Swiss-Prot record:
Gene: CRHR1
Annotated protein name in UniProt: Corticotropin-releasing factor receptor 1
UniProt key word Transferase: no
Keyword field contains Manganese: no
Top-level taxon of origin: Eukaryota
Listed result of changing I290A: Strongly reduces antagonist binding
Variant or mutagenesis effect after changing F284A: Slightly reduces antagonist binding
One GO-annotated biological process of the protein: immune response
Transmembrane segments: 112-142, 150-174, 190-218, 226-253, 270-295, 307-331, 339-368
Organism from which the protein derives: Homo sapiens (Human)
Length: 415
């Protein structure tokens, strides 16, 4: 209601004409509520104000609290807030009732809609930026064959999984109308299954990243023993039977609304959410061990203590998004507080939509091998296309015996 929450109520009171019959019934109801109260001494009698709020019999000198009206003059109000009225020392009610806390639910719904639309914009913007960054990173890994080691192949597959997930996200957003949801046609269920499959592959490729780092840093095994097919089985293979089992469960127990959401008491979604949470927990253990080893190695070095901690913090900040620990935030319940829910909605929307962008930055754009390979290619391209290179090549060509040079013509003319 803005800065004057009583303004609408006051305007309504000026135009209000209560039906005598309904007012009488309200008085009787209010009086019946007060019968149970046993008050001695000076008191205010039960009363119904012009808004319809019942103020029960109360002792003199007391501030009485009553819920805000649920519905008044065509406007719904939040009944979790309260109105206040004082029972004066002389046993009469104060003329003024404090309804300053009573807020229109209409305004709250408008605020919720605004926050929802902003969150939708953040989601679309984040997924667009992420998809562009992921495609650029994918092309770089495709073109730069000189850096194709197992570590970068894992990065490449993770980026591919994120591309497919982002692409199916756009398919879901653009095709899943309310009518399609209700019809529950076969293709929309396949789209949902594909989206969930690529979502799970993101987690398992992050698990592959964690396995590789843990093997290389903590277990100190030679990474030459690791094979590409092992990680392909983990990243692309393991999620497939998980999603098949989930789809069968949905088909038999929750076959509605294109398999989005879930009915109360049906827990088929945990078939794929459970393994995702499990690999997150394992990655958390990997992260703890990796940071512990990094701290030990840094402490054993000759650098100062400040530099040691700085490197440890940098390593931690890099490893957090790499191992997917940020997804832990998506399982947090923000509670009923409005501020917490708004912050959670924005924070969740930002993290989920920009996750692909962060992966591209950490795995590709900040990758020293990728940057070095790009720099070499750029220098080769400059050498090939620069004027200096063309002149140098022309000067290096030997003069043919049958070709007369400009210098020899000049000398013969002088003679």
């Amino acid at each position: 209601m803005g800065g004057h929450p009583q303004l609408r109520l006051v305007k309504a009171l000026l135009l209000l004409g209560l039906n005598p019959v309904s007012a009488s019934l309200q008085d009787q109801h209010c009086e019946s509520l007060s019968l149970a109260s046993n008050i001695s001494g000076l008191q205010c009698n039960a009363s119904v104000d012009l808004i319809g709020t019942c103020w029960p019999r109360s002792p003199a000198g007391q501030l009485v609290v009553r819920p805000c009206p649920a519905f008044f003059y065509g406007v719904r109000y939040n009944t979790t807030n309260n109105g206040y009225r004082e029972c004066l020392a002389n046993g009469s009610w104060a003329a003024r009732v404090n309804y300053s806390e009573c807020q229109e639910i209409l305004n709250e719904e408008k605020k919720s809609k605004v926050h929802y639309h902003v969150a939708v914009i953040i989601n679309y913007l984040g997924h667009c930026i992420s998809l562009v960054a992921l495609l650029v990173a994918f092309v770089l890994f495709l073109r730069l064959r000189s850096i194709r080691c197992l570590r970068n192949i894992i990065h490449w597959n993770l980026i591919s999984a994120f591309i497919l997930r982002n692409a199916t996200w756009f398919v879901v957003q653009l095709t899943m109308s309310p009518e399609v949801h209700q019809s529950n046609v076969g293709w929309c269920r396949l789209v949902t299954a594909a989206y969930n499959y690529f979502h799970v592959t993101n987690f398992f490729w992050m698990f592959g990243e964690g396995c590789y780092l843990h093997t290389a840093i903590v277990l100190t095994y030679s990474t030459d023993r690791l094979r590409k097919w092992m990680f392909i089985c983990i990243g692309w293979g393991v999620p497939f039977p998980i999603i098949v089992a989930w789809a069968i469960g949905k088909l038999y127990y929750d076959n509605e609304k294109c398999w989005f959401g879930k009915r109360p008491g049906v827990y088929t979604d945990y078939i794929y959410q459970g393994p995702m949470i499990l690999v997150l927990l394992i990655n958390f253990i990997f992260l703890f061990n990796i940071v512990r080893i990094l701290m030990t190695k840094l402490r054993a070095s000759t650098t100062s203590e400040t530099i040691q901690y700085r490197k440890a913090v940098k390593a931690t900040l890099v490893l957090l998004p790499l191992l997917g620990i940020t997804y832990m935030l998506f399982f947090v319940n923000p509670g009923e507080d409005e501020v917490s829910r708004v912050v959670f909605i924005y924070f969740n929307s930002f993290l989920e939509s920009f996750q692909g962008f962060f992966v591209s930055v950490f795995y590709c754009f900040l990758n020293s091998e990728v940057r070095s390979a790009i720099r070499k290619r750029w220098h080769r391209w400059q050498d090939k296309h620069s004027i200096r290179a063309r002149v140098a090549r022309a000067m290096s060509i030997p003069t043919s015996p049958t070709r007369v040079s400009f210098h020899s013509i000049k000398q013969s003319t002088a003679v």
